[in-house]
Amino acid sequence: MSRIGKKPVPVPAGVTASVEGQTVKAKGAKGELSFVVHDEVLVKMEDGAVRVDPRDQSKEARSKWGMSRTMISNIFVGVKDGFEKKLEISGVGYRAAMQGKNLQLSLGFSHEVVYDVPAGITVAVPKPTEIVVTGIDKQQVGQVAAEIREYRGPEPYKGKGVKYAGEKIVRKEGKKK
């Protein structure tokens, strides 16, 4: 069993952190985030680091312990550097373009797919076959990337569709004559 929770989360340079009850707040160059820690976990500031401990030795408290530590670490990284996910589009005629604040996707349907980008997330299209999703909240960046990918996930025969950069698509063999 992992014991990542034992390790205190150091507050990086350029980030101010505060603990108020069960809420951890972080403010940095990219913005401000807060995370409410589960009641089964105790959280406190010690020597420029945030320490997380289980309230007792119950299974629920121990299961929330490591997750809470990682979530706090993610908000520190998010407000300092931010998070980024890249998507690649492959297929004849498949492309993406920004239309104001919305992402317009041509994915082989009879209509264009228009994705409304949520607040706090930035979507860029450096090339028509490449989408870059950035933001300070790791969960929200991953969610937006997953929603874009869901419109036309990669298919196993030709690999056409939207996939994460670096994602391996398990290919299938076609019909034999």
UniProtKB/Swiss-Prot annotation:
Keywords from the named record: Ribonucleoprotein, Ribosomal protein, RNA-binding, rRNA-binding
PROSITE patterns: RIBOSOMAL_L6_1
Family matches, as InterPro entries: Ribosomal_uL6-like (IPR000702), Ribosomal_uL6-like_a/b-dom_sf (IPR036789), Ribosomal_uL6_a/b-dom (IPR020040), Ribosomal_uL6_bac-type (IPR019906), Ribosomal_uL6_CS (IPR002358)
GO MF annotations, alphabetized: rRNA binding; structural constituent of ribosome
One of the protein's GO biological processes: cytoplasmic translation
GO CC terms in record: cytosolic large ribosomal subunit
NCBIfam families: L6_bact
Quaternary organization: Part of the 50S ribosomal subunit.
Function: This protein binds to the 23S rRNA, and is important in its secondary structure. It is located near the subunit interface in the base of the L7/L12 stalk, and near the tRNA binding site of the peptidyltransferase center.
HAMAP family for the chain: Ribosomal_uL6_B
Family the UniProt entry places it in: Belongs to the universal ribosomal protein uL6 family.
Protein name (record): Large ribosomal subunit protein uL6
Organism listed in the record: Brucella canis (strain ATCC 23365 / NCTC 10854 / RM-666)
